[in-house]
C-alpha cells in the first residue's frame, strides 16, 4: 500500500492536539520547519538514460548535473502516472523521487516503454527526504532541491539516510502539521489528488512540470491539445473551507444547486482559518468563490469553494 499523508481526521482536534500542532504549523508557515517525508527513489543510469527519459517525461531532462526539475510521467492517453522530481546526478545518471509507495507503479510504467534501451532502472533503498518548509527554508538549507509551491516555499534534502540530516536549529515538525499546510497550499499528492483518472491541467501542475519546447514524449498529445485550447478542462482542483466546525470525510460529495459537482480528496483542520479545509475536484461550472454543500452518508455541511492557495 503506497504511503500517503496522515489518515483522514474523523473529528476536530481537541485543545491539546491543537496546541501540539500550533508551533509546528507556525514554523512551516511563518518561519522554517523540517518534516521527514516518505518518498521513493529510482536510479535510471546508462548510455541511453538521457534519451530514454527525454521520451518518457514531460519535462526537459537536459538539466545540469547537480540540479533538478519537476516532471510528470504519463500514460499514453495523457493521464497521470506520477508527479516526480528529476535529479541529474551524472552525465548518464538520474535519480527520480516521488511520493512514497509508488515505486512499483513507476517502474512498471517505465519498463513498458524500455525497448532496446541501454539504461538500467532500479529502486534505491535507504534514502530519505527531509522537507524544509517556510519563508526561511532556502536560507536554512541552501543546497536543497527546490520544492517551492505558491504560498508554501521550501527545499528538500535528499540522499542516503545516514548522510541527510536536518539543518541546524530548524524545528522538527509533525506530518500532521505539514498536512494542514499542504492542503492550504493546494499541493497534490499521489493516491489522493493524483491518480490515473487525472488530467495534469485539472490538478494545476502543468506550469511546474511540463516543457512545451521539448520534443515528443509519451502522453504529450493530450497535454498539448488542452494547452492550445486555453487549458480548459471539465474540473479543477480547488480549495474548500467549511462554514462551521463539522469535519467532512474524504470522499464527501460537493453539491451545488441540484447537482453533484465534485468530491473531496483531502481534509484537515486549519487553526489559522478556524475551520476544516479540504482539497477537491470541482466542475468548472462552479467558479470560485462559490457556496456549496458537502454531503456524505449521515451528514452534510455548508462550505465555500475558493481558488488556491487558501493561505499565502
Listing of model-derived features with the role each one plays in the protein:
Residues 48-53, 103-107, 137-140, 161-168, ...:
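Short, conserved charged micro-motifs
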Residues 33-34, 40-41, 82-189:
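Acidic, low-complexity central loop/insert segments
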Residues 158-237, 241:
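Anionic-ligand-binding alpha/beta catalytic cores of soluble enzymes and soluble regulatory domains
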Residues 2-5, 84, 198, 206-210, ...:
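Glycine-rich, small/acidic residue-mixed loop/short-helix segments
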Residues 21-30, 73-83, 114-117, 138-145, ...:
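Short amphipathic beta-strand starts and helix->beta connectors
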Residues 46, 96, 134, 157, ...:
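Residue-level signal for inorganic ion chemistry
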Residues 54-62, 108-116, 228, 256-259:
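Short, intrinsically disordered, mixed-charge
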Residues 1-81, 90:
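Acidic, proline/glycine-enriched N-terminal capping motif
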Amino acid at each position: 500500500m503506497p504511503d500517503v499523508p496522515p489518515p483522514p481526521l474523523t473529528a476536530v482536534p481537541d485543545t491539546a492536539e491543537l496546541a501540539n500542532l500550533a508551533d509546528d504549523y507556525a514554523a512551516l508557515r511563518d518561519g522554517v520547519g523540517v518534516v521527514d517525508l516518505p518518498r521513493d527513489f529510482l536510479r535510471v543510469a546508462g548510455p541511453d538514460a538521457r534519451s530514454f527519459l527525454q521520451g518518457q517525461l514531460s519535462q526537459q531532462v537536459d538539466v545540469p548535473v547537480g540540479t533538478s526539475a519537476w516532471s510528470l510521467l504519463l500514460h499514453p492517453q495523457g493521464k497521470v502516472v506520477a508527479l516526480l522530481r528529476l535529479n541529474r546526478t551524472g552525465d548518464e545518471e538520474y535519480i527520480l523521487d516521488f511520493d512514497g509507495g509508488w515505486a512499483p507503479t513507476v517502474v512498471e510504467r517505465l519498463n513498458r516503454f524500455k525497448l532496446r534501451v541501454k539504461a538500467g532502472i532500479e529502486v534505491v533503498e535507504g534514502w530519505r527526504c527531509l522537507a524544509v518548509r517556510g519563508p526561511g527554508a532556502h536560507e536554512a538549507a541552501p543546497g536543497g532541491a527546490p520544492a517551492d509551491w505558491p504560498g508554501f516555499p521550501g527545499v528538500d534534502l535528499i540522499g542516503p539516510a545516514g548522510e541527510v540530516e536536518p539543518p541546524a536549529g530548524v524545528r522538527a515538525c509533525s506530518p500532521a502539521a505539514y498536512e494542514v499546510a499542504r492542503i492550504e497550499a493546494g499541493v497534490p499528492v499521489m493516491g489522493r489528488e493524483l491518480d490515473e483518472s487525472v488530467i495534469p491541467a485539472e490538478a494545476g501542475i502543468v506550469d511546474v512540470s511540463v516543457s512545451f519546447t521539448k520534443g515528443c514524449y509519451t502522453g504529450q498529445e493530450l497535454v498539448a491539445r488542452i494547452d492550445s485550447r486555453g487549458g480548459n478542462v471539465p474540473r479543477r482542483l480547488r480549495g474548500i473551507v467549511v462554514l462551521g466546525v463539522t469535519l467532512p470525510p474524504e470522499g464527501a460529495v460537493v453539491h451545488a444547486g441540484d447537482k453533484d459537482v465534485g468530491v473531496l480528496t483531502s481534509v484537515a483542520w486549519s487553526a489559522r482559518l478556524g475551520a476544516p479545509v479540504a482539497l477537491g475536484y470541482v466542475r468548472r461550472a462552479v467558479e470560485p468563490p462559490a457556496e456549496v454543500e458537502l454531503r456524505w452518508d449521515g451528514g452534510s455541511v455548508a462550505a465555500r469553494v475558493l481558488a488556491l492557495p487558501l493561505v499565502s
